[in-house]
Design a protein with these regions (language model features):
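Active-site loop/turn elements of alpha/beta-hydrolase fold enzymes
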Residues: 14-16, 79, 174
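Flexible "cap/lid" loop of the alpha/beta hydrolase fold
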Residues: 74-107
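Catalytic histidine-centered segment of alpha/beta-hydrolase-like enzymes
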Residues: 198-207
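Active-site loop/oxyanion-hole signature of alpha/beta-hydrolase fold enzymes
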Residues: 11-50
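Conserved serine/cysteine hydrolase catalytic core
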Residues: 122-197
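Gly/Ala-rich beta-loop-alpha elbow adjacent to hydrolase catalytic centers
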Residues: 52-57, 61
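Short amphipathic alpha-helix adjacent to the substrate-entry channel of hydrolases
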Residues: 1-10
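Active-site loop signature of alpha/beta-hydrolase-fold enzymes
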Residues: 17-20, 82, 201
Length: 217
């Protein structure tokens, strides 16, 4: 609703989430997922696009941009870094992240997430989101033992990952993660950090700022 009608957009859900189909991802890795997204872009003849990614999609975007050169910019919302993906939080946790994890533990993941969606969306949209999530959850519960929900991601996936300086990179993150991103695989001479928010789902709380950047691009 916040993007002008002249801007087209394509949303790709991870397998086994959102509106994507249910499939066993045993034996599948991140490169397989990158190839699948690349095939979608080719099939739809999409060129000159801006990648908007959240969390684990960040590392997928890095690999995709090395494969497809039509990306004009990357807007990354708290993309996953190698430092956090494989960190030992028992030794050196972020106090702020620890506080969020305590809230999730105290209220339970579902109630914590429901509070966020209720704050963000009108009741009709919020109801639709939760009906979809519950439907997907029920489908996943019916799968056979050994069913793998997500692709395997290893330390090797983060090796030799880089982004060319020609692509503008905009990273939305909470203030306490600034240093992490300045030292991460997403940092180039053409990277800009936008600090704000107090949870991981900044695509909701910072949506106006994200739209402003997309319009300018």
């Amino acid at each position: 609703e916040k993007l002008p009608p002249t801007i087209g957009y394509l949303t790709i859900d991870f397998p086994n989430t959102g509106r994507s189909s249910i499939q066993n991802l045993a034996g599948k890795n991140l490169d397989n997922l990158v190839d699948a997204v690349y095939e979608i872009l080719k099939k739809l003849n999409i060129s000159d696009y801006v990648l908007c990614v959240h969390s684990l999609s960040g590392i997928l975007a890095c690999k995709l941009m090395n494969k497809d050169f039509n990306c004009q910019a990357l807007v990354a919302i708290e993309p996953t870094t190698k430092k956090v993906m494989f960190a030992d939080f028992s030794k050196n946790p972020y106090p702020e992240m620890e506080k969020q994890m305590r809230l999730i533990e105290e209220f339970g993941p579902e109630l914590y997430f429901k509070n966020l969606t209720q704050t963000t969306f009108i009741p009709e949209i919020n109801k639709e989101i939760w009906e979809l999530m519950q439907e997907k959850g029920s489908e996943l519960e019916c799968q056979v033992p050994g069913f793998q929900v997500s692709v395997e991601i290893t330390k090797e996936d983060f090796e030799d990952v880089s982004i060319t300086d020609r692509i503008p990179v905009f990273i939305f993150c909470q203030a306490y993660r600034e240093k992490e991103y300045r030292e991460s695989e997403y940092w180039t001479a053409n990277t800009k950090l936008i600090l704000g928010g107090n949870h991981h789902y900044l695509q909701w709380s910072e949506s106006e700022k994200i739209v402003d950047i997309i319009k300018k691009l």
